[in-house]
Design a protein with these regions (language model features):
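Charged, alpha-helix-forming regions
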Residues: 1-303
Length: 303
């Protein structure tokens, strides 16, 4: 089992020892099909084109490791949050390589830091992120530009040769993701309960709601066929629709209330996503969110 190191004894090893940060995600990756939504190994690629044909995403899994999953992407959320924290501190030389101890990372993303199996799963996730290939024209700015990258340029673990104990790990973010973090408005806050969502589809739906619903007074409406295409799901549309309706009926996403709308002009159902704090206070789904990265409006702050 890996032990948490005594950082005072390792001054040569920079550790981003920040496990209680407000969470951030890079906004360009939140609504498109960049990750597998299933925990089972996916070896089929994702090929997505927006309805207007102006945006496309292609994701290619490694045959040995499979495609990076939306649970693997928790590591990227943590890394994005670390970079944003450096920016907020006023750091001027922000590296693409982040060094840390796996114990701290596992705690930060809501995983157990106890037991060898959790560290093995972390290493497998890092392998999938390093070997999943992505091509997209997102952020092309109207030009015929294509970005090709992996979710991590590399990762490595530093092990004490004498004790065989881990002194830490490091990951290097790809330039595409790194520039997206540094760009103005390039990140969005993520609710801390996101890591408690167990289903891949629920996790992705939260990201869609956060990206599109935001703080819009009337929320955001999206048709089921459009959601299905954006998800990159391998399951048949009929099964996807059944699962999505059950998720809407449970209505357990952090921050956002889901309403299933069965009768639409197209004949297909749609989903209404609206922020709970914007509902009328008498609505059963209303919930005021007090988050550590946001302050309540003046007059509503607790004494």
């Amino acid at each position: 089992m890996l032990k948490k190191p005594d950082y005072a004894r390792q001054p040569d090893f920079f550790v981003a020892y920040l496990t209680d940060l407000p969470l951030r995600d890079q906004r360009d990756v939140m609504e498109r099909p960049f990750f597998s939504l299933a925990k089972s190994k996916r070896t089929e690629p994702i090929e997505y084109t927006s309805p207007k044909g102006d945006i496309w995403v292609k994701v290619f899994p490694n045959t040995s490791f499979g495609m990076a999953t939306i649970w693997d992407a928790d590591i990227l959320i943590w890394a994005v949050s670390q970079v944003v924290e450096m920016m907020n501190r006023g750091d001027t030389d922000i590296p693409r390589t982040i060094r840390f101890h796996p114990y701290d990372l596992l705690k930060a993303i809501g995983r157990s830091p106890k037991g060898k199996e959790h560290y093995d799963r972390l290493r497998s996730a890092l392998d999938r992120l390093t070997h999943t290939a992505v091509k997209t024209n997102i952020r092309a700015g109207g030009l015929k530009k294509t970005a090709s990258f992996h979710w991590l340029d590399s990762w490595r673990e530093i092990v004490d040769e004498r004790t065989q104990q881990s002194r830490g790990m490091e990951v290097t973010l790809p330039d595409w993701l790194y520039k997206g973090i540094l760009a103005k408005g390039g990140v969005l806050s993520i609710h801390e309960d996101y890591f408690h969502l167990t289903g891949g589809l629920e996790r992705w739906l939260y990201k869609v709601a956060r990206k599109h619903g935001g703080m819009q007074e009337h929320g955001f409406f999206i048709s089921l066929p459009t959601l299905y295409e954006k998800s990159g799901s391998e399951e048949p549309y009929r099964n996807f629709k059944i699962r999505l309706r059950k998720i809407a009926e449970r209505d357990e996403l952090p921050e956002y209330h889901l309403v299933w709308l069965a009768d639409t002009e197209s004949g297909e159902p749609s989903l209404h996503m609206v922020r709970r704090s914007l509902l009328h206070y008498t609505d059963p789904a209303f919930k005021w969110e007090l988050r550590r990265d946001r302050r309540a409006p003046k007059g509503l702050r607790s004494a």
